C-alpha cells in the first residue's frame, strides 16, 4: 500500500509537471503568434479634411471677393453644412481615434464653425428675419461671432508653428480672414459701406490664399501615397527643437 501510494503521488507529480510544461509551451506559442500577427492600421483622413476645407474656403472666398458678381454667400450653404460642416466633424473624430489631438481640434473647430455659419445664413433658421427691423444689430452680432472664432484660430496658428510653414500659413491667413470679415461686418453696422466692402474683399483674398495652402497640402498627401514623393512643407520642428535645447541650457 505504501509503495502504491508513493507511485500514485509520483505519477500525479509527473502529470502536473507535464501539464505545467504544456501550459507554458501553449502560452509561449500564443505569445509568439500574437507577436507575428500584423497590427491593423487605420488610414489617415487628413487629405479628406484638407480637401473639404479647401473647397469650402476657396468658394466662399471667391464669393467674398465678388468674382463674376457672385456676392451672395447663401449659395454655399450646402458647403457649410455638408462639405465643411459634417465632413470636417467626421474627419475630426477619425483623427481622434488615430491619436492626433491637433488634427481633431482643428478639423473639429472648422467643422463646427461651418455648421454655425451655415445656420446663420440659412433662411430656415430665421436668423436674418429676427433682425429684419435692426440690420445693424445683425451685422454687429455676426461681427462678434467671427471675431471670437478668429481668436480660436489664432491658437491653432500658434500650435502649428513648431510643425511646418504650410500649416502655419494656412491657419495664419485664415485667422486674418476671420478678423477682416469681422471688421467688415462692424463697418456695415456703422453705415461705412465702402470700408465694409473693401474689408470683405480683403478677407476673401486672405481666405483664398488659405485655401491654396490647403490645396497644396492635399497634393502633398495624395502624391505621398500614390506617387511615392511629396511636396516640401517647410518643416520647422528642427528649429523649435534647437530653441528648446538652448532654453534648457
UniProtKB/Swiss-Prot annotation:
The record's listing under Pfam families reads:
Gpr1_Fun34_YaaH
Localization, per the record, is:
Endoplasmic reticulum membrane
Q: Supply the induction statement.
A: Expression is correlated with the production of patulin. Expression is positively regulated by the secondary metabolism regulator laeA. Expression is strongly decreased with increased sucrose concentrations. This decrease is lost in the presence of malic acid. Expression is increased with pH changes from 2.5 to 3.5 in the presence of a limiting concentration of sucrose, 50 mM. Natural phenols present in apple fruits such as chlorogenic acid or the flavonoid epicatechin modulate patulin biosynthesis.
Q: Which InterPro entries match?
A: AceTr, Gpr1/Fun34/SatP-like
- Known pathway: Mycotoxin biosynthesis; patulin biosynthesis
Q: How does it sit in the membrane?
A: Multi-pass membrane protein
One function term, GO molecular function aspect: acetate transmembrane transporter activity
Keywords, A to Z, come to: Endoplasmic reticulum, Membrane, Transmembrane, Transmembrane helix
Biotech use, in short, is:
Patulin was originally used as an antibiotic and specifically trialed to be used against the common cold, but it is no longer used for that purpose since it has been shown to induce immunological, neurological and gastrointestinal effects. Genotoxic effects of patulin with dose-dependent increase in DNA strand breaks in brain, liver and kidneys have been detected in mice. However, more recently, it has been proposed that patulin might also have anti-tumor properties.
Record note on disruption phenotype: Strongly reduces the production of patulin.
Gene Ontology cellular component list: endoplasmic reticulum membrane; plasma membrane
Superkingdom, natural source? Eukaryota
Biological process per Gene Ontology, one example term: patulin biosynthetic process
Mind telling me which residue stretches traverse the membrane in this protein? 42-62, 71-91, 106-126, 141-161, 169-189, 202-222
UniProt family annotation: Belongs to the acetate uptake transporter (AceTr) (TC 2.A.96) family.
Q: What does this protein do?
A: Acetate transporter protein; part of the gene cluster that mediates the biosynthesis of patulin, an acetate-derived tetraketide mycotoxin produced by several fungal species that shows antimicrobial properties against several bacteria. May be involved in the uptake of acetate, a substrate for the synthesis of 6-methylsalicylic acid by the polyketide synthase patK.
Q: What is this protein called?
A: Acetate transporter protein patA
Which organism does this record belong to?
Answer: Penicillium expansum (Blue mold rot fungus)
Species lineage: Eukaryota, Fungi, Dikarya, Ascomycota, Pezizomycotina
Amino acid at each position: 500500500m505504501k509503495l502504491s501510494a508513493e507511485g500514485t503521488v509520483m505519477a500525479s507529480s509527473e502529470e502536473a509537471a507535464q501539464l505545467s510544461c504544456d501550459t507554458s509551451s501553449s502560452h509561449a506559442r500564443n505569445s509568439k503568434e500574437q507577436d507575428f500577427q500584423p497590427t491593423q492600421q487605420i488610414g489617415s483622413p487628413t487629405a479628406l479634411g484638407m480637401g473639404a476645407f479647401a473647397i469650402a474656403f476657396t468658394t466662399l472666398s471667391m464669393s467674398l471677393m465678388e468674382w463674376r458678381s457672385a456676392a451672395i454667400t447663401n449659395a454655399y450653404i450646402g458647403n457649410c453644412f455638408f462639405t465643411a460642416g459634417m465632413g470636417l466633424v467626421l474627419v475630426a473624430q477619425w483623427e481622434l481615434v488615430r491619436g492626433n489631438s491637433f488634427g481633431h481640434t482643428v478639423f473639429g473647430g472648422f467643422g463646427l464653425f461651418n455648421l454655425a455659419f451655415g445656420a446663420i445664413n440659412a433662411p430656415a433658421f430665421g436668423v436674418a428675419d429676427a433682425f429684419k427691423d435692426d440690420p445693424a444689430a445683425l451685422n454687429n452680432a455676426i461681427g462678434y461671432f467671427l471675431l471670437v472664432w478668429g481668436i480660436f484660430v489664432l491658437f491653432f496658428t500658434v500650435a502649428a508653428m513648431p510643425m511646418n510653414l504650410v500649416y502655419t500659413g494656412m491657419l495664419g491667413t485664415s485667422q486674418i480672414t476671420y478678423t477682416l470679415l469681422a471688421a467688415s461686418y462692424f463697418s456695415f453696422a456703422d453705415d461705412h459701406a465702402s470700408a465694409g466692402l473693401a474689408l470683405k474683399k480683403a478677407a476673401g483674398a486672405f481666405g483664398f490664399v488659405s485655401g491654396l495652402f490647403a490645396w497644396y497640402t492635399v497634393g502633398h498627401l495624395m502624391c505621398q501615397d500614390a506617387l511615392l514623393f511629396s511636396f516640401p512643407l517647410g518643416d520647422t520642428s528642427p528649429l523649435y527643437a534647437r530653441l528648446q535645447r538652448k532654453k534648457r541650457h
